[in-house]
Design a protein with these regions (language model features):
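Short helix-to-turn junction characteristic of helix-turn-helix DNA-binding domains
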Residues: 22, 53-57
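N-terminal leader segment of winged-helix/HTH proteins
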Residues: 1-40
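Short alpha-helical "packing" element that flanks the helix-turn-helix/winged-helix DNA-binding module
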Residues: 49-50
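C-terminal regulatory/oligomerization modules of transcriptional regulators
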Residues: 1-14, 132-151
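The alpha-helix within a helix-turn-helix
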Residues: 65
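Charged, amphipathic alpha-helical coiled-coil/dimerization segments
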Residues: 30, 58, 62, 80-144
Length: 151
């Protein structure tokens, strides 16, 4: 169960360390995600890949790197494992013979559909930890940080 409390904020210099605070926030978000999706659920990265592939069939792994922000080597390993699990299918790209195109399998589409409400519930729980007036700003700031990683 996720624990919350303001006492953890009073840790001296760590209380103003963005890297420390982001790490703690990530731990909390991962705990909530795991509670909502369950032990057999998709990981956050698996969900991100399936969601991206659902938006556009035939994406190359390079395009998936850009869409998900997952680094190239991690994504290659992830796609290989997801293909072995039957969540994705790979084929030669029609646009670039050197590249492999990725698309959802029927199993991947079913798992994605089942995961969406669970991930939405996790996201709602995370956002509910913030006052309503801060939620949009928080999301915008996270998007800015994520965009800086792509720059």
């Amino acid at each position: 169960m996720v624990k919350a409390g303001k006492a953890a904020r009073k840790v001296g210099p760590l209380a103003t360390s963005p890297s420390h605070l982001m790490h703690r926030a990530l731990q909390l978000a991962l705990d909530i995600y795991a509670e909502e999706t369950g032990a057999d659920g998709l990981t956050q990265r698996q969900f991100a890949v399936l969601e991206a592939v659902s938006l556009k069939a035939g994406l190359t792994q390079t395009e998936l790197v850009r869409m998900t922000g997952i680094d190239r080597s991690t994504l290659a390993d992830l796609v290989t494992r997801m293909t072995a699990k039957g969540l994705l299918e790979r084929e030669r790209s029609t646009l670039d013979a050197r590249a492999k195109a990725v698309r959802l399998s029927a199993e991947g589409a079913a798992r994605l559909e089942a995961a969406r409400p669970l991930v939405e519930a996790a996201d709602k729980r995370i956002m509910a930890l913030l006052p309503k007036g801060q939620r949009e700003t928080f999301l915008n700031q996270l998007a800015d940080l994520a965009a800086a990683a792509d720059a």
